[in-house]
Structures are given as structure tokens and as C-alpha cells.
Amino acid sequence: MRSKLFLLSVILLICVSCRHKKAATDKETVTTENTYTNPLLEYGAEPWAIYHEGKYYYTQGSENKIILWETNDITDLSHATQKEVWIPNDPSNSYHLWAPEIHRIDNKWYIYFAADDGNMDNHHIYVIENVSANPLEGEFVMKGRIKTDKDDNWAIHASTFEHRGERYLIWCGWPKRRIEAETQCIYIAKMENPWTLSSDRVMISEPEYEWERQWISPDGSKTAYPIHVNEAPQFFESKNKDKVLIYYCASGSWTPYYCIGLLTADAGSDLTDAASWKKLDTPVFEQQPEDSVFGPGSPSFVPSPDGKEWYMLYHARRIPNDAPGATDSRSP
């Protein structure tokens, strides 16, 4: 796994769940000065961060609000400044605030998140905006819900990026409203502005391999119906910028089989053409039971302060899966 990531020029901040660990030798000196300890917080799913003018701004999923953390050190979140920046007051988007992401676009701050009215079948993507220089100051205001297709299908896990002068949105959505089973796929579209799409959605990945379609945990616990998952897409570029990379998560997040897959496209190709994308047939990051790391996923990437490395944030569990009704034990 590590070799795959390095071949793609990604230098990751990865915990003991790497498949190929290098043992220390007597010629190596290990100090605590530049080390970190996982997990970074006791609890928290769907971690996401951005680095801007010497500060990291971090956020994670919640049930009913959005919190931002501000810190000089992304590995020291427990001592970061925190602020609640969004508490919804519209019943249609006041529940299950999943996978918030903060982006700096045209000198304004935007947070993308999914929310619903209490019924998770009604999840949609929303965008809020803050014109202040610091996102912990000023006020976020609702820009609206992103309508992702003409049928207004279920949509979560939105992320945005700019490539060669064009802004794109990538997200997880349903091909159509579920009946007896559910399939979650990765979509892409061009954007007119940070809260409006300018092209039709195009599916670039669906769960096809066995490792993408796991929904039953080893202890037999499962959802009420089959759910096959591709979700949480994240943009990255190869070192020489000749490839566009989309990391995404596969299989049910409630299982230990949750993992990270990879899509690639040539940088000069039409990113809204499904034929431009190729999928690796094995995950690039997955559970490591011997180290008690299960279901790693929901990646995001931030640079080190000196710009020499890239860090990957992700969540995982220390147990295979949570018992029904138990507190979510995922942590970043």
C-alpha cells in the first residue's frame, strides 16, 4: 500500500495502520521532538482541514452544528482554538450535518456540508459563506442547497477543487432513489460559482469490486438493507501535475472493511467524461487488525507548514465495529 501511495507522489502522515512498517535499527535515532500520536482527538469522524496563512482550520462531522478548530499544529488539535460557526435554524437542514469541508475561494470562506430534515433519505448538500479574513470571525450565511441533478437525488460528501481554470464539485450520490437496496456513487460536475453547478452530473465511480461492496460486519451486524458505498471523494495531483487523483472511500463506514480507493485521470483530459477515469482494482489504504486500526477512511490532505510534505487526515476505529446503538467510536 505504501509503495502505491509514494509512486503517486503522496507523502502521507500515516499512523501504525500502514501495511509495510519499517522497523527501527540501531543506526536510527527516534526523538519525540517531531513526532505525533494518533488519534489526534478522542472522537470525531470525517476530518477535514485546510492550511491558510500559517494556520490550519479543521472541522469534522456532527449531528447538529459545525465547529471549526484553529491551530498552528495539525497534530495538536486537542489544544486548538474552537468555535461553533454554524447552528442551523431551518428544519429542512438541521440534522445529520455530515462531512463539512472549509474552502477558501475568491477571498471568501465556504463550508460545504450535507444535512437533512431528520430523515437521512433526504440528505442534500448545502453551502455557507463567510467574507471575513478569518473564518472564526464574522458570520457564515447560507448560500443555499446545491441541486445536483434534475431529480434532486440524495447527495452527501461534497468537495470542490479548481483545475486548469475550471472549478469542479465532486460528491457521493444516488443514481436514483433507493427501493430495496442502496448504491452510493461518485459524481463530478463543473461549477458556475461556489454554490451552483453549471453542467450535468457525471458518474465516475460506482461500487464494483468486492472490497467496495461490504456492508456486513464480522459479528453479523448490518444495516436494514444492502448498502454498497463509494463516497468521500478528495482531489489531489501527482507531483509533476500530469495526473488528477481522486481518493474515495468504499464499503460501509460501519464495518471494519471501510477503506480508501483511488481514481486517476490525465491532467489534460475532460474530467467530466467518465471514460477519462481509471480505478485501481485494490484499495490503497485499509484496516490493520494487528494494530487495532479498523475502517480507515474519509481522507483529506494538507501541506506541512514548510510545504515539503503532505499530511493525510483520516478517521478510524480501534475496534472492528460499534455495537448497535453505541456511541460512534471513530476518531481522527
Q: Whereabouts are the PLM-identified features?
A:
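Bacterial Sec-dependent N-terminal signal peptides
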Residues: M1-E28
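Carbohydrate-active catalytic/glycan-binding domains of CAZyme proteins
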Residues: C18-P332
